[in-house]
């Protein structure tokens, strides 16, 4: 249909002209607060690879098990990992890789609120339900890096520090004297 006014004219496309949205079978679903998911994405997305030679690493791995969500991203040089407890889990343990572009969209849609976001995993797609908004993206297929073996478990060097002090140091410039 066309919309015409004396000062403007617009040609609109009907909904029927667009392809139907894919059906996402709700095999698995998880719910968490929007602010928690947003924070997880902010802390992990920087390590999502932009190199297309390994397409599966252009996204972040979501691992859901034992009432917790682990999010992992790697780019060949960096590995980012974050784990959070879940509020609601349906269907048991599961994992998937979400494209980095979809992560940035989810982050922009999520507010700094305790309202829930539901993530539903289908055979080929992922559905994010954030309030009245639905975002559907295609899962990335392939073998994601075994990050558990990439992080050494036994190391003779251990550092114990207060979180606030460590964060304060990370934002300052240290100059160490040399002998």
Model-identified regions with their sequence ranges:
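A short, hydrophobic C-terminal helix/tail in secreted or cell-surface proteins
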Residues: 175-179
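Structural preference for solvent-exposed beta-strand-turn elements
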Residues: 1-174
């Amino acid at each position: 249909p066309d919309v015409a006014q004396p000062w403007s004219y617009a040609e609109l496309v009907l909904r029927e002209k667009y392809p139907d949205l894919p059906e996402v079978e709700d095999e698995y679903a998880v719910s968490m607060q929007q602010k928690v998911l947003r924070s997880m994405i902010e802390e992990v997305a920087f390590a999502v690879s932009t190199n297309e030679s390994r397409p599966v690493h252009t996204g972040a791995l979501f691992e859901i098990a034992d009432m917790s969500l682990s999010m992992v991203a790697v780019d060949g040089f960096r590995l980012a990992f974050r784990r959070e407890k879940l509020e609601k889990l349906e269907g048991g343990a599961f994992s998937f890789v979400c494209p980095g572009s979809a992560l940035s969209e989810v982050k922009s849609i999520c507010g700094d609120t305790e309202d829930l976001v539901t993530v539903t995993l289908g055979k080929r797609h992922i559905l994010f339900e954030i309030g009245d908004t639905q975002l559907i993206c295609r899962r990335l297929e392939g073998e994601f890096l075994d990050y558990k073996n990439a992080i050494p478990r036994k190391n003779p060097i251990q550092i114990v520090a207060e979180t606030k002090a460590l964060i304060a140091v990370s934002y300052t410039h240290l100059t160490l004297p040399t002998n």
